[in-house]
UniProtKB/Swiss-Prot annotation:
It comes from Bungarus fasciatus. Residues 1-21 form the signal peptide. This is Neurotoxin 3FTx-LT. Keywords: Acetylcholine receptor inhibiting toxin, Disulfide bond, Ion channel impairing toxin, Neurotoxin, Postsynaptic neurotoxin, Secreted, Signal, Toxin. The keyword Signal applies. GO terms for cellular component: extracellular region. It is found in: Secreted. Expressed by the venom gland. Disulfide bonds join C24-C45, C27-C32, C38-C63, C67-C78, C79-C84. Binds with low affinity to muscular (alpha-1-beta-1-delta-epsilon/CHRNA1-CHRNB1-CHRND-CHRNE) and very low affinity to neuronal (alpha-7/CHRNA7) nicotinic acetylcholine receptor (nAChR). Belongs to the three-finger toxin family. Ancestral subfamily. Orphan group II sub-subfamily. InterPro entries: Snake_3FTx, Snake_toxin-like_sf, Snake_toxin_con_site, Toxin_cobra-type.
Length: 86
């Protein structure tokens, strides 16, 4: 009986862990509230900052599998918890 109970506990823990999906903010505005569920393999939230020539400051956000390299005059921040790219 103890073996069966232990097996059920282990299976439950494994199944709960497999079902986790990261959520990140996804919008270009400075103050963002739009939440997006990331796809499998996208384990990071990303926030970029740059100043556009025509439309001012931009703050694109989203999900990523790897942290992208910053382009010239750009700041990139990556994190791995839900909605951490504020």
């Amino acid at each position: 009986m103890k073996t069966l109970l232990l097996t059920l506990v282990v299976v439950t823990i494994v199944c709960l862990d497999l079902g986790y999906t990261l959520t990140c903010l996804i919008c270009p505005e400075k103050y963002c509230q739009k939440v997006h569920t990331c796809r499998d393999g996208e384990n990071l939230c990303v926030k970029r900052f740059y100043e556009g020539k025509r439309f001012g400051k931009k703050y694109p956000r989203g999900c990523a599998a790897t942290c992208p390299e910053a382009k010239p005059h750009e700041i990139v921040e990556c994190c791995s918890t839900d909605k951490c790219n504020k």
